[in-house]
């Protein structure tokens, strides 16, 4: 899932300081799952903004908080917010960067304030209470060849043909030796499966054209039936 983190309150307050009417919109997708941007977090941010204005002796803030199914879906965002957004000059979004941009596109006359920093595509380790980056969305997945361990993401240098000379005792030289060397993990995984032929396979340099930005994916739009 997309992993995100709420911005510092000071930064959110600064972006919102010139608005007397604000709509806070959470997202029930990724940011809600990781408890950063759902309905509960929207209500908490609403209370904090109201408190901040009162403590500074400013005029009363008119603010509403809600959450929608997915902010990254044009139709859902437009349909869910069309009636409520018209009363507010600015919207605080608790979605990832995609959600923020979707709202900005659908409501071009509104100021969309991002309250969340999008970090990476990752895995949640509930027991450790941590999120780990696992995928770069590179557009050319080779996980079958690497035992389900991504060298593009988990190797600090994104090497494709084995470890560099900087690994020591299975640890990467980048990050003060805290991270496992991805290619040592790959070697051990493939060895367990008797698939070391995949480890020794030579891989050509990546074709970065498949990950050029901005990207799009999808077929041709549906043809509308002509009216008789």
Regions flagged by a language model, labelled:
Residues 99-102:
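Short, well-ordered alpha-helical microsegments
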